[in-house]
């Protein structure tokens, strides 16, 4: 990372630091959830570790007052940037009534919050893609200046929903930003056993849209790609397919044993490019972050995480008689 790249992209010094703070908050919430899971307090974790830079860099490039996001299950960085809180995410992890995603009904990672235009996802992967296309179409019909931003893993890009959504969006030049977070594994299946093409973005040409592959460990590179896609969408030029390359630093989920399909040496080598470390180094090079500032930031974040954990652990579960609430609109 070279000096002051963020300024060349139109980001202020404060925005550049805020990106790091959001990445660090996502990581610390995620780490706490693993501890809670291993101590038997929450049943399931599906991690964002290693993908925070792509998620936060993308979110900062969007209009967070207007655009719609349709995140996939690892996108803690996206939803935090769009207004969810540590408390919201902990309520979801503990499946408590105050969980804003589903009132304690869904598994963690099924993000949804109407007030922040975070659209609820489903457990079958890639269902969010055609939904994003539908939102973009509705925005076009209602003459609203919005974009729909949708994410998915590289394994999900092999599903029919991806093809149908990408084709429809391209034909109708809809303002959709497709972002594939390629973390090298679809659960246990390595990338080279999933697809024959070199990059997921190579598929874009078949739909008649631009495709670009960027370093998912660099939030500024992702920011630039998403910003350009957002501007292109606003000009009425249609969708863009962005592929971010990162590495999943944890097992697929808390129920997975990744030692059965990848070695510790591979994971340890990937940790050398941990986006929190590389972006931290950039901020220190540019004089925006010092050890003292970082420690203060970490102390503040851990206080937030601790408070969110305590509140969620002590919060009530949903009443049994409310089990069928929210099935139908009233």
From Swiss-Prot:
Subunit architecture: Heterotetramer of two alpha and two beta chains. Directly associated with ODBB in the E1 complex.
GO biological process: one example: branched-chain amino acid catabolic process
Origin superkingdom: Bacteria
Enzyme Commission code: 1.2.4.4
Residues binding substrate: 44, 73, 107-110, 123
Entry GO MF terms: 3-methyl-2-oxobutanoate dehydrogenase (2-methylpropanoyl-transferring) activity; metal ion binding
Reactions this protein catalyses: N(6)-[(R)-lipoyl]-L-lysyl-[protein] + 3-methyl-2-oxobutanoate + H(+) = N(6)-[(R)-S(8)-2-methylpropanoyldihydrolipoyl]-L-lysyl-[protein] + CO2
Location of region: Disordered: 249-272
Protein name, entry field: 2-oxoisovalerate dehydrogenase subunit alpha
Cofactor: thiamine diphosphate
Gene: bfmBAA
Record function comment: The branched-chain alpha-keto dehydrogenase complex catalyzes the overall conversion of alpha-keto acids to acyl-CoA and CO(2). It contains multiple copies of three enzymatic components: branched-chain alpha-keto acid decarboxylase (E1), lipoamide acyltransferase (E2) and lipoamide dehydrogenase (E3).
Residues where Mg(2+) binds: 154, 183, 185
Record-listed thiamine diphosphate binding positions: 72-74, 123-125, 153-159, 183-187, 252
Basic and acidic residues bias locations: 259-272
Keywords, alphabetical: Magnesium, Metal-binding, Oxidoreductase, Thiamine pyrophosphate
Pfam families the record matches: E1_dh (PF00676)
Family designation: Belongs to the BCKDHA family.
SUPFAM superfamilies with a match to the protein in the record: Thiamin diphosphate-binding fold (THDP-binding) (SSF52518)
CDD domains, alphabetized: TPP_E1_PDC_ADC_BCADC
């Amino acid at each position: 990372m070279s000096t002051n790249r963020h300024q060349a992209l139109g980001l202020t010094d404060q925005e550049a630091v805020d990106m790091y703070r959001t990445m660090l908050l996502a990581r610390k919430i995620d780490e706490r959830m693993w501890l809670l899971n291993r101590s038997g307090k929450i049943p399931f974790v599906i991690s964002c570790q290693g993908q925070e830079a792509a998620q936060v860099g993308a979110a900062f490039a969007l209009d967070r007052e207007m655009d719609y996001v349709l995140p996939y299950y690892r996108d803690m960085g996206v939803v935090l940037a769009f207004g969810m809180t540590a408390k919201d995410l902990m309520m979801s992890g503990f499946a408590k009534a105050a969980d804003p995603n589903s009132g304690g009904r869904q598994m963690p990672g099924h993000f949804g919050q109407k007030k922040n235009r975070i659209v609820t996802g489903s457990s079958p992967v890639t269902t969010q893609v055609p939904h994003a296309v539908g939102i973009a179409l509705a925005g076009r019909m209602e003459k609203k200046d919005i974009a729909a931003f949708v994410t998915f893993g590289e394994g999900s890009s092999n599903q029919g929903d991806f093809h149908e959504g990408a084709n429809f969006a391209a034909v109708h030049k809809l303002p959709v930003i497709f972002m594939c977070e390629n973390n090298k594994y679809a659960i246990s299946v390595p990338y080279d056993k999933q697809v024959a093409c070199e990059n997921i973005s190579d598929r874009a040409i078949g739909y008649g849209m631009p495709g670009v592959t960027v370093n998912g460990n660099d939030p500024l590179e992702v920011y630039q790609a998403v910003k350009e896609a957002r501007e292109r969408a606003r000009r009425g030029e249609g969708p863009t397919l962005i592929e971010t390359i990162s590495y999943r630093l944890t097992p697929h989920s808390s129920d997975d044993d990744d030692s059965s399909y990848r070695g510790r040496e591979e994971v340890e080598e990937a940790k050398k490019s941990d986006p929190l470390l590389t972006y931290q180094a950039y901020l220190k090079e540019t004089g925006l972050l010092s050890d003292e500032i970082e420690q203060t930031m970490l102390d503040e974040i851990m206080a937030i995480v601790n408070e969110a954990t305590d509140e969620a652990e002590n919060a009530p579960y949903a009443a049994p008689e409310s089990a069928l609430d929210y099935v139908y609109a009233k």
